[in-house]
Amino acid sequence: MVGLPTWINQQTGAQARKAMDNQTDNPYPIHDLLRQRWSPRAFDDRPIEPEKLRSLFEAARWAPSLDNGQPWRFLVATKDETAEYERLFNCLVTGNQKSAYRAPVLMLSVAQLQFEDGSPNAHALHDTGMAVENLVVQATALGLVARQMAGFRIDQAREDCQIPDGYEPVVMIAVGYPGDPALQSDRLRAQEPQLPVRKPLTELVYSATWELPSSLFRQG
């Protein structure tokens, strides 16, 4: 039993994941890991085993990319690395600091904007996002949770983390075991995900004519 949060009332990890799984509304079947992935604001502050952290980055490493350019880079710090952790933490805006302060690991994804030959990589951000998704899904498989945060000071991250020109900070990620929402403020607790809401597929998937829903999802 790993990552057992107190708010699950001592359910097993599998039962806890099933409880979250039941919150999603999927008219068509998808993999359980995709159903179970979520972005919490409550983290348990216990450390993540190093082998699990290595597994996250190995998953990210195997993401697809244009011409196998692999533009993603990750800065990572655990709470044991106090100065490094604070360097990343201090880049977060106040609201995200309040939700991420218990997370034992912080990461910053960064995209290399050009190929090794110096030519621009127009898909660097897309490919870095795919690597992050691999990482997040792997975290779910290991009983961890990950919250991606766009609210951070990009210029401060560039300076404090010595990110060179030609690289773009993309997203900050807090990773940990699920925590107890009762330890949060009322405001943050109210923001914890309840029933995830997604637009219907008819609004997202078109035929080869813009905004004409694909015949896969047309009614009648």
Describe the predicted segments one by one.
Residues V2-G220:
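Acidic, surface-exposed loops and disordered segments
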